[in-house]
Amino acid sequence: MAVFQPFCAVRPKPQYARDVAALPYDVMNSEEAREAVQGKPLSFLHVDKAEIDLPRDVDPYDDSVYAKARENLLALSENGYLLQDAAPCFYLYRQIMDGRSQTGLVGCASIDDYLNDVIKKHEFTRADKE
């Protein structure tokens, strides 16, 4: 049986959730992300696509990008936009797009379970993809 445990998440305070929320980093390139954050200083894209806050000629995998991501995450936290839950929890979420609803549960899993295929990899969770 796979290990699946609650954890203390770091997340936006409710009043800032809409401002921090962003599309996933891997659905847009750096230029699209730069455009998406115009006028949105709290967007999480400043953390998970931090090259947008550096000169355009910086390689997205350069160490300076990771340093900038850390700086931006710390700024969100230190300026009071994020909170960490006091007690471990499981987190339920629902995404709705084009009339389809998808519900999920977030918790902590064991890396050993992942590496030993106790947990199915994201790409192989449907029979038609195996």
Regions found by a protein language model. Give the residues of each.
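A cross-family signal for N-terminal binding/gating loops and helix N-caps
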Residues: 1-129
